[in-house]
């Protein structure tokens, strides 16, 4: 039985539509190379909440909360070819999307 190679691509962004759009573009590129692909798998969304005082001096009870969510998607590519890797390297992702690649 042959050992399968895997590439895992994790996409992170504060805008869920941007993550979904670029996940589909990556999938389209990989499908052209006939590699096996799983995804996009939505990972749990993390919400970060920051609480700050409204006033710099008094009124400790008067506070304001700011929240933002980070959305993540996972794409797994099985048995990638050299052409698959070349096409993935040529993709130019926008600055709002963070990409993490593990093999």
Swiss-Prot record:
Transmembrane segments: none annotated. One of its GO terms (molecular function) is structural constituent of ribosome. The keyword Lipoprotein does not apply. It holds the Pfam family Ribosomal_S10. One of its GO terms (biological process) is translation. SUPFAM superfamilies: Ribosomal protein S10. PANTHER family: 30S RIBOSOMAL PROTEIN S10 FAMILY MEMBER. Belongs to the universal ribosomal protein uS10 family. Part of the 30S ribosomal subunit. HAMAP family: Ribosomal_uS10. Involved in the binding of tRNA to the ribosomes. This is Small ribosomal subunit protein uS10.
């Amino acid at each position: 039985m042959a050992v399968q190679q895997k590439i895992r691509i994790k996409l992170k962004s504060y805008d869920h539509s941007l993550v979904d759009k670029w996940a589909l573009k990556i999938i389209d590129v990989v499908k052209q190379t006939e590699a096996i692909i799983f995804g996009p798998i939505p990972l749990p969304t993390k919400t970060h909440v920051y609480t700050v005082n409204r006033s710099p001096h008094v009124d400790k009870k008067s506070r304001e909360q700011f929240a933002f969510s980070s959305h993540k998607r996972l794409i797994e590519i099985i048995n990638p070819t050299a052409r698959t890797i070349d096409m993935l390297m040529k993709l130019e992702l926008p600055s709002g999307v963070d990409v993490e690649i593990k093999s």
